[in-house]
Amino acid sequence: MTMSLIAGVAAFVLTVLAMPHFITYYKIKKIGGQQMHEDVKQHLAKAGTPTMGGTVFLVVAILISLIFNFHVFTEGHPAYGATAGILFVILIYGIIGFLDDFLKIFHQINEGLKPWQKMALQIVAGLLFYFIHVLPSGTNSLAIGGLTIQLGVFYVLFVLFWIVGFSNAVNLTDGIDGLASVSVVISLIAYGIIAFVKGELAILTIIITMIGALLGFFVFNHKPAKVFMGDVGSLSLGAMLAVISIALRVEWTLLLIGVVYVLETASVMLQVSYFKYTKRKYGEGRRIFRMTPFHHHLELGGISGKGEKWSEWKVDAFLWTIGALASSITLWMVLGNVMK
């Protein structure tokens, strides 16, 4: 546990030291920044803000996790599969996000990777995780409370759905200063406690290391943000949460621990579906929310969408609180043996 905490502190310090150099390089080279939604006027001032900051905290977190978990890879440790699988997913999804950001920023391709290209790469990465960790472990079921759901060969489909789904869900959440970074920290704290109780110290080290790196990133990402994480950060973080829940055998918990990401994704799906339905039925599309993902709806008019505009700090605080409460309830359920 002590070494895990040292790893977290090291990740925080290195990220804080490295990020200013990344931001300065970005500005000196006059690299194009992230484009903003014109519908949210207060975001227009952020145009040109350096993005791809996730590259820094991912490199730091991966390297420090490898150093502090070195014994896992050299001594045939039982946690080898889970540790290697988690770090592999963080790396590969980070590369996918990096490619997406690179095309948008350096080649001025607005959509980055085409949706089918991004999805294909995410599925391949998910399959590799399945073969690295899940298949060797013999896992093919979901445990929810006292109920065990045997999925057999279909468990691989669940794994792919979980990883790809939450990877994109965190990506949707990363829309205002500090929201995604702190939301993921809250989620990781919950999983860190579960990992500690289960005695999964190698996984705990990865979790605490990423928490340290994200807190270091938040120093520059809180409002007004000096840098954004980009897809390189958000896609990787979402996939990381998914594989950690799988490795700890508490997959169901991510629906609660990750409730903010679920809410953000659900708002987009509902908005698109309702718009298409009403356009077919009434000849014009109608909306449930002022704008999606949900954090933009809050910005434009609060919970009802018709009230005063919310500041980014207020939106952050509201969604962070929801995430913290949901994570606390989940921990009570898991640690209190209500559900495992």
Swiss-Prot record:
- Provide the species name: Streptococcus thermophilus (strain ATCC BAA-250 / LMG 18311)
Q: Gene behind this chain?
A: mraY
| Transmembrane domains' residue ranges | 3-23, 53-73, 79-99, 119-139, 144-164, 176-196, 200-220, 227-247, 250-270, 315-335
Q: Which GO terms describe its molecular function?
A: metal ion binding; phospho-N-acetylmuramoyl-pentapeptide-transferase activity
Q: What does this protein do?
A: Catalyzes the initial step of the lipid cycle reactions in the biosynthesis of the cell wall peptidoglycan: transfers peptidoglycan precursor phospho-MurNAc-pentapeptide from UDP-MurNAc-pentapeptide onto the lipid carrier undecaprenyl phosphate, yielding undecaprenyl-pyrophosphoryl-MurNAc-pentapeptide, known as lipid I.
Q: What protein name does the entry list?
A: Phospho-N-acetylmuramoyl-pentapeptide-transferase
Q: Which pathway does it operate in?
A: Cell wall biogenesis; peptidoglycan biosynthesis
Quickly give the catalysed reaction: UDP-N-acetyl-alpha-D-muramoyl-L-alanyl-gamma-D-glutamyl-L-lysyl-D-alanyl-D-alanine + di-trans,octa-cis-undecaprenyl phosphate = Mur2Ac(oyl-L-Ala-gamma-D-Glu-L-Lys-D-Ala-D-Ala)-di-trans,octa-cis-undecaprenyl diphosphate + UMP
Bilayer topology reads: Multi-pass membrane protein
**One BP term from GO:** cell wall organization
